[in-house]
């Protein structure tokens, strides 16, 4: 807030403040701030990043405008791409999965069995990890790949050069604009095909990302034009999961969880920044209409 008072146009500060306020459900001036941010996006101003704008009530086209403007200002396509149209003569298609989340993180928890189930007779799969965290999930991830390369100390250009030297056919970005993302790697266009998958189920807004893997639920056909990528819809759902993940046998009582012994329990275990005042208003009216009901929320922070 002090920064805004000194330099009102400081890049992305307004969006960051809004994002932090939503983490603690501080909805003071919420609608006025939303209007300000949407106006800024319409005028191609650097008011909010795509990830933070994702939770602003806005149209898919506005999301695209925000992403494209952000990428153009921060991660523009390099003037000379590293891949120049070469056709690799591989016996197997080489796929590189690129992420900071090859540890006990939602991405690996969901994707681990996909890595393990790749048809090795047709594909060679390589992990490029730009986070050096290691845990029991990392051990399983490493075993699932043909090659696992720690690139946490590499620059974006060095990672891109590695992709080119490995003759990767398909580079899959598992981060998008989320935390620890390194979109600058893909700006060098080191692979013939570059794909947006899982980490961010919205457009990256970059001309050098060719496809997004989605489904008809998260990207209905009428919104395909609001993506800079070509939308590839998987059947049923784009979501993967791990069938080997054990399900706990422990059964909790309502009392152990701090819930009343009777009455309907409404639940939302999303992070608090995803809750809007409009949504919360609906919940409150539901509680009024359902006698003895309660709302169970995830406590993301003590505030």
Residues covered by each model-derived region:
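Conserved short loop/turn motifs at secondary-structure junctions
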Residues: 20, 271-272, 297-302
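A generic structural signal for short coil/turn motifs at secondary-structure boundaries
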Residues: 104-106, 274-276, 298
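Residues that mark the start of a beta-strand
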Residues: 92-96, 263-265, 294
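A conserved nucleotide-sugar
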Residues: 122-124, 284-303
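Substrate-binding clefts and catalytic carboxylate motifs of secreted carbohydrate-active enzymes
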Residues: 267-278, 285-288
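Alpha-helical solenoid repeat scaffolds of the TPR/TPR-like class and their adjacent stem/linker regions
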Residues: 1-259, 271, 281
């Amino acid at each position: 807030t002090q920064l805004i008072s000194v330099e009102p146009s400081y890049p992305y500060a307004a969006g960051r403040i809004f994002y932090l306020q939503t983490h603690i459900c501080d909805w003071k001036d919420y609608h006025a701030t939303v209007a300000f941010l949407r106006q800024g996006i319409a005028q191609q101003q650097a008011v909010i990043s795509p990830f933070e704008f994702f939770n602003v009530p806005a149209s898919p086209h506005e999301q695209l405008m925000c992403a494209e403007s952000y990428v153009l200002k921060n991660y523009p396509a390099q003037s000379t791409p590293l891949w120049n149209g070469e056709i690799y003569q591989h016996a197997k298609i080489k796929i590189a999965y690129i992420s900071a989340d090859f540890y006990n993180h939602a991405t690996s928890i969901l994707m681990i069995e996909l890595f393990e189930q790749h048809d090795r007779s047709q594909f060679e799969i390589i992990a490029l990890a730009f986070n050096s965290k290691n845990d029991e999930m990392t051990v399983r991830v490493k075993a699932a790949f043909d090659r696992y390369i720690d690139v946490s100390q590499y620059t974006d250009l060095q990672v891109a050069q590695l992709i080119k030297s490995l003759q990767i056919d398909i580079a899959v970005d598992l981060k998008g604009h989320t935390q620890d993302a390194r979109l600058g790697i893909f700006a060098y266009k080191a692979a013939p095909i570059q794909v947006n998958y899982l980490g961010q189920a919205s457009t990256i807004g970059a001309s050098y990302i060719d496809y997004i893997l989605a489904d008809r639920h998260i990207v209905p056909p009428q919104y395909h034009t609001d993506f800079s990528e070509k939308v590839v819809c998987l059947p049923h759902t784009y979501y993967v999961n791990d069938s080997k993940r054990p399900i706990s046998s422990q059964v909790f009582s309502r009392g152990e969880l701090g819930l009343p012994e009777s009455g309907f329990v409404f639940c939302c275990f999303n992070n608090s920044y995803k809750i809007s005042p409009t949504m919360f208003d609906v919940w409150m009216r539901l509680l009024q209409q359902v006698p003895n009901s309660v709302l169970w929320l995830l406590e993301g922070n003590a505030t």
